[in-house]
Design a protein with these regions (language model features):
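Conserved small-residue
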Residues: 138-147, 337-343, 354-450, 488-493
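Hydrophobic, lipid-facing positions within transmembrane beta-strands of outer-membrane proteins
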Residues: 45-49, 102-108, 122, 184-190, ...
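Small-side-chain secondary-structure face that scaffolds active or pore-lining regions
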Residues: 42-44, 50-147, 191, 209-224, ...
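Short loop/turn motifs that connect adjacent beta-strands in outer-membrane beta-barrel proteins
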Residues: 5, 56-58, 115-122, 197, ...
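Transmembrane beta-strands of outer-membrane beta-barrel proteins
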Residues: 61-65, 122-126, 200-202, 246-252, ...
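Solvent-exposed loop/turn elements at secondary-structure boundaries
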Residues: 134-167, 239-296, 308-342
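Outer-membrane beta-barrel pore domains and translocons
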Residues: 65-70, 127-131, 203-207, 232-234, ...
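Outer-membrane beta-barrel transmembrane strand signature
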Residues: 5-52, 162-189, 193, 199-203, ...
Length: 494
């Protein structure tokens, strides 16, 4: 189907839509199901090799090597007559893309464990790891409608090869790109057990990532370190033995972990092959840092009644720093920065019970509930020193990240109201063209938060011989939901 008033003689003899509504958003669903073809073929190779060797007494060596290789082909064909935004396809659309990627991981580790005087256990591990990622993509597309001969889905049938094609409304394109990334690290972990009652753990990691090396200016490799410490105390070992108590453990941990910035060349300038121009240099990335999360956690684990019943209670507090994002500068440029501080803290509780009804029947049930609160403690400061507001979302509402607010706060435009609380209308005498008066149009009214502070769940597993039935009921308490459908219904008075 083409424009019913102008017609399209090139589609004579071709399959077309039979559809009453000629609208850019409406297509016959059977047409879409059968004349919009998308083929995807993927081949994947996975390989894992592990080598273990005993060097001397309690010292062991292990190395692992993993490879993940993927090739993929994506072919997309849209037949002429598909209605799109602002036009209809008079020739059809064609896309063909080939990609391949590989991920390689290798590590080497030495471990040593021993027990002294039948009271102290020591476990130590040191090692190094290396990972590498590579991907390449080549694609050919007729980017809107460039097929000179309708529904001939081959790369030769495009506006470039047929410059006099009156039906070509956009150019075709060929694209090829590749990406490489690597990271390497040195790490060490240690665990000490005292009298089978107290266990102390610690770890350290020194990491190099390719994304940071562009900022070294030839002065070596830039690295970052992460670390953690933990303690576990078996309290029941310090108490008189009780038959109903199997284990009572207190645990605590503290850690600093991080993620590198995206692996892209931040000072990259683009070259236009059609006219030979070079884009302006983007703003500099000042003092790039990894995104880091500092976490503290403590809790109790309890096992009772021959390990049939157990529960644990956990308190956690974590702070995310140096989030990577792009901000808009005063002159409208997009600048990469590390900024912000978001704190999350909360409580988690879970319990489970196992009942062996008889030799064939068994029932296990579990319940969990968690409460979480977060606060945005810091955001990026503009050149004037004012906090920078990050917002996202459709025109109906925005999710704003404002200093002092919470992650997921929803803001909307509000209506101006008169002294009686009624919404003001821009022209009360002409109701046909009248529209409500907005208070500001800058999404300044906070209406709630989209995240639920409380989550919970109840699971049950019934086992009879070799047959198992499992079901889960979960839920969220709190949080706001925005309905764009309801807004459209209000528009039509429904």
């Amino acid at each position: 189907m083409s424009d019913p008033e102008k017609g399209n003689p090139k589609l004579i003899g071709q399959p077309v839509q039979t559809w009453y509504w000629y609208d850019q958003y409406l297509n016959n669903p059977y047409w879409v199901a059968n004349m919009y073809n998308d083929y995807l073929k993927r081949d994947r190779l996975l390989a894992n090799i592990t080598l273990d060797a005993k060097i001397w007494q309690n010292i062991k060596y292990q190395t692992r090597f993993n490879v993940d290789y993927v090739t993929q082909n994506n072919l997309n064909e849209e037949y002429a007559g598909m209605n799109r935004v602002g036009f209809d396809y008079v020739g059809g659309k064609y896309y063909n893309g080939d990609s391949r990627s590989s991920d390689i991981y290798n590590d080497h580790m030495l471990t040593w464990n021993d027990r002294f005087n039948d009271k102290i256990d020591v476990n130590v591990a040191v090692g190094t790891s290396f990972s590498r990622h590579y991907d390449r993509n080549t694609s050919i597309t007729t980017a809107i409608d460039t097929c000179g001969v309708p529904n001939a889905f081959v790369p030769q049938n495009n506006k470039h090869s047929r410059p006099n094609n009156p039906n070509g409304s956009a150019t075709s394109a060929s694209d090829s790109w590749n990406n490489k990334d690597w990271s390497t690290a040195l790490f060490a972990t240690a665990s000490v057990g005292l009298f089978d009652k107290v266990y102390l753990d610690g770890s350290y990691r020194l990491e190099w990532a390719q994304s940071f090396q562009q900022f070294t200016q030839g002065s070596g490799y830039k690295s970052f370190d992460y670390y953690s410490a933990g303690v576990n105390v078996l309290i029941d070992k310090f108490l008189p033995r009780r038959d109903w108590l199997n284990q009572l453990k207190w645990r605590g941990s503290w850690s600093v972990v991080g993620n590198p910035i995206p692996n892209t060349l931040f000072a990259r300038q683009s070259y236009d092959f059609s006219n030979g121009t070079i884009s302006t240099r983007p703003p500099l990335f000042d003092d790039p840092q990894p995104e880091t999360t500092t976490s503290f956690e403590t809790g109790l684990d309890v096992w009772m009644f021959e390990n049939k019943f157990n529960f644990d209670l956990t308190y956690y507090n974590s702070t995310l720093r140096n989030q990577f994002l792009y901000v808009t500068t005063a002159n409208g440029e997009s600048k990469p920065v590390n900024t912000g501080k978001i704190r999350n803290y909360g409580l988690e509780f879970q319990a489970s019970y196992r009942w062996n009804i008889n030799k064939d029947w068994r029932w296990q049930t579990g319940f969990n509930i968690a409460w979480n609160d977060n606060r945005i403690l810091e955001t990026y400061k503009t050149e004037s020193g004012a906090p920078y507001e990050v917002q996202m979302g459709p025109n109906a509402f925005k999710i704003k990240y404002v200093e002092g607010g919470r992650y997921g706060d929803i803001y909307v435009n509000s209506f101006a109201r008169d002294e009686n609380g009624h919404i003001k209308i821009n022209d009360a005498g002409n109701y046909e063209n009248a529209v409500p008066v907005m208070a500001s149009g800058k999404y300044e009214t906070k209406v709630g938060n989209m995240t639920s502070p409380v989550t919970l769940g109840w699971n049950n597993t019934f086992t009879w011989k070799n047959f198992t039935l499992y079901f889960l009921i979960d839920g969220r308490i709190g949080g706001k939901v925005m309905s764009l459908t309801e807004a459209d219904l209000d528009l039509y008075g429904l």
